Swiss-Prot record:
Region Disordered, residue ranges: 292-317
Ranges of biased composition (kind: Basic residues): 304-317
Complexes and interactors: Interacts with GCN1; prevents the interaction of GCN1 with EIF2AK4/GCN2 and inhibits EIF2AK4/GCN2 kinase activity. Interaction with RPL39; this interaction occurs in a GCN1-independent manner. Associates with ribosomes; this interaction occurs in a GCN1-independent manner. Associates with actin; this interaction occurs in a GCN1-independent manner.
Name of the protein: Protein IMPACT
Species whose genome carries this gene: Oryctolagus cuniculus
Family stated for the protein in its record: Belongs to the IMPACT family.
A Pfam family recorded for this sequence: UPF0029
Amino acid sequence: MAEGDAGSDQRQNEEIEAMAAIYGEEWCVIDDCAKIFCIRISDDIDDPKWTLCLQVMLPNEYPGTAPPIYQLNAPWLKGQERADLSNSLEEIYIQNIGESILYLWVEKIRDVLIEKSQMTEPGPEVKKKTEEVVVECEDDPIVPPQPENSAKAVDVRVREKPREVEEIPPIDHGVPITDRRSTFQAHLAPVVCPEQVKMVLSKLYENKKISSATHNIYAYRIYCEDKQTFLQDSEDDGETAAGGRLLHLMEILNVRNVLVVVSRWYGGILLGPDRFKHINNCARNILVEKNYTSSPEESSKALGKNKKMKNKKRNEH
């Protein structure tokens, strides 16, 4: 190892130890070997109104000649607001080249959240819009305890805790799929109204690992007996088109009265189209396991039938 690399490694280790000591449970080690970490930052520890997850990967050249590779995860952070915060972090790096800056970044973000809480209404604490970079906050997957028309549903993203008018449905967790350090895991709950969708999402996001996932893609279908229609919707959570693909799978399998959430923890290697395959496989596996489809064989037949119908339509045009 070069002398410079050894020096950087020592400084990184010292900074990591300091961050863990300062922030305690808020500081999470994602991949110690790859130097990937995340920290959940809020405007107020006891009564958070605004929360953001900062995920960082420390390159070998940091802090000497390169900045940390970072990702800001928050559902409300978009457009100019995201650009302004990114510019602030990059300005801190430029002003402190060669120095350890993670603490400065965290406290800058906290200042922004505090300022935001004083100026605006509370935002969602638990979901986030991200792009395909970096990961979550713990290593182990979640372990579970021992004629039809489509009607677009109202936006059910969690903006406040739902009223306790319904019992929270039971939530099941699927077997994780891991590929090139990315992990995918499905979560499923029976739902019969949008209020239950909100409740399940809120309950899931109470789990630090799930709420810190790079993406939480979901879709649901609720059959309305009186109108003979489906109430359904989906959410990409920053993984473009993933929610629509998941909903399409559920339509093909003709499942009803169910919510499926697929968490993805990105491991630093781009998967390309394979990520959509893993998302749908996770969802399909748990739907089959929980008997929302008749059998794996019938699910495959349904998919094959759908492809044939599409090909037939193409040939007719």
